[in-house]
Amino acid sequence: PTFHERSAELTAADISRIDIASATRELIRTSFTSTASTEEIESAKELILQAVEILQSSNGGPGSAASESHFSDRSPFYGAMNPLSMPMSMERDDSIGEFGAVVGIATFTEPYEGPPGHVHGGFIAAAFDEVLGMAQSLTGRPGMTGRLTVTYRAPTPLYQPIRYCGWVDRVEGRKIFTKGTAHNGETLCAEVEGLFLSMPAELMDLLRKGRDLSTPPGEALTGVIEKGRES
């Protein structure tokens, strides 16, 4: 499986993490829009702090559970275990381009608002990065973002399904050039061109196996990154 593909079935613990992420996602949205009284907000805060204490009481270490999960679980855009994700739905469309395309559907809510009633441009760009990142991995030589150029064509509304589409335009050595669009119905909201740099397989393996949120990358990992830049 690629970096973006799950290689194992969901466990009971995985499903519980998906459920708590969904509940937390709703909490984020509701706390952002609620008109509850000060007393009610204080009561809710105490319950939240109790939940945090329960989760921390048996914590295996900073970031330990996240380190064990797959990127498809913890992605900030389509990861079902990540409360910050929309989450986007992702599908492959083999009818587009040499390697196929990735289509993502996202519905942005108030926490993602920029202009009144519309999505902040930074989130639009970040969602493009996620879709193009998955699209470039279809080459079998996945890399990391080198450049992302977004052109905004029309305001992107909240609470509407936004259709992202990303595909590989061409490959030149270790450079993977990508393109993409974002539509609200028939309206083109934004388009993008991205450059990804294919990285050595050993670097991707180290990133997967050696990831530890509690400590910075070690010298061995830094050396592999430098090797990737030189190749």
Q: How should these model regions be labeled?
A:
Residues P1-G60, T156-L158, D169-S231:
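HotDog/MaoC-like acyl-thioester-processing domains
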Residues V103-A127, M134-S137:
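A conserved, well-ordered hydrophobic junction motif at loop->secondary-structure transitions
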Residues F99-V103, R147, P161-R163, F177, ...:
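Intrinsic-disorder/low-complexity, polar/charged segments enriched in Ser/Thr/Lys/Arg/Asp/Glu/Gln
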Residues P1-A8, E130-R163:
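Hydrophobic beta-strand-centered segment that forms part of the acyl-chain substrate-binding groove
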Residues I41-E113:
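Long amphipathic N-terminal alpha/beta scaffold segment
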Residues S89, T149-T151, R163-W167, T181, ...:
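Residues located in well-ordered beta-strands
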